[in-house]
């Protein structure tokens, strides 16, 4: 992607996650889903990003949904993170990739397709190393990369 000038530098807070071993699998407690889930590389990025949204940026945990199911035609997909505004309208979609997966035009196209079904003001893609945020410019019907994550409204 040629948007490096708009890459957002994130300093994640120190992790304070509950991690356990069960039946040969490593599990992490997801405080949003209120259960232990398998700790995959993508889940590690998601949990750190969620922690950042709530602990650093002050996003209300009660307005964050995880793995929101949507349909693209007949295909069932899941948005990694959906942040809602105070009126419970979808406000931001976040797509998480594992740390060694580069963010690309394909990643951006994936989340834009999600936006067609679940319109939001912001789209975020992150792999925990690189993060990009786009704001939907409704009047111009285009996306603008912005230099920081917005304050929650």
Language-model segment annotations:
Residues 2-122, 129-153:
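A short, conserved, highly charged catalytic patch centered on acidic carboxylates
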């Amino acid at each position: 992607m040629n948007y490096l000038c708009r890459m957002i530098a994130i300093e994640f807070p120190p992790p304070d996650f509950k991690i356990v071993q069960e039946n040969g699998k490593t599990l992490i407690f997801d405080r949003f889903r209120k259960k232990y889930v398998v700790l995959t590389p993508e889940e590690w990025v998601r949990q750190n990003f969620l922690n950042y949204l709530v602990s650093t940026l002050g996003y209300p945990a009660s307005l964050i949904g995880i793995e929101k199911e949507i349909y693209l035609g007949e295909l069932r997909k899941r948005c990694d993170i959906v942040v809602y505004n105070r009126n419970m309208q979808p406000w931001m979609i976040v797509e998480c990739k594992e740390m060694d997966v580069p963010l690309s035009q394909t990643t951006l196209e994936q989340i834009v397709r999600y936006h067609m079904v679940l319109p939001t003001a912001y789209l975020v893609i992150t792999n925990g190393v690189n993060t990009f945020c786009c704001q939907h410019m409704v009047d111009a019907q285009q996306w603008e990369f912005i230099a920081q994550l917005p304050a929650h409204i």
